[in-house]
Amino acid sequence: LVSGEPHAGERVWRNLLKSDAAVDLVHFTILRPPEKQDGVPVDELSLIAFPTRELFVEKIKEFDLIIFDRYRMRGILPTSYIENVVNYVREGGTVLVAAGPEFGAVDSLYRSPLAEILPVAPTAQVIEEGFRPKITDLGRRHPVTEGLEKEAPEGGWGRWFRQIEVEQTAGQVLMSGAHG
């Protein structure tokens, strides 16, 4: 789990992943981007040096899933490490990009080698209106979302209030958003 910045949803990811004893979570949160100058010495920003080379070069094939959570390309991870993630996916690995408006920004992961394997391209439009996502016909049969409707609370799932507009470039649509 690579978190681009601290936020409340980060705790949800941690709790979800740590709730399964079979998951060995490695979590990296960027507390301060390199361009921010706040007077805190670099050696005081973490308890240990994060082993990025070890994780993104030597041990990348050992992961079942790599999650980028609100991650931006701000010089923290070298482009060569992102290229390693692309190769990891091409060789059968899995990546999940959980993003908000930053997905359409100039420092988006989409503007990196990762774009080669992403099924959507951001339009830079952010739709900010209430909507309820719906499972598509394909989504009702797909192993990722099959049975999800049965798990919905009485009255259905809550509304979502933001969607990043994208153009589908590959893959299959399992859920529809604000405008169908």
What name fits each language-model region?
Residues 1-180:
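A conserved amphipathic helix/loop scaffold
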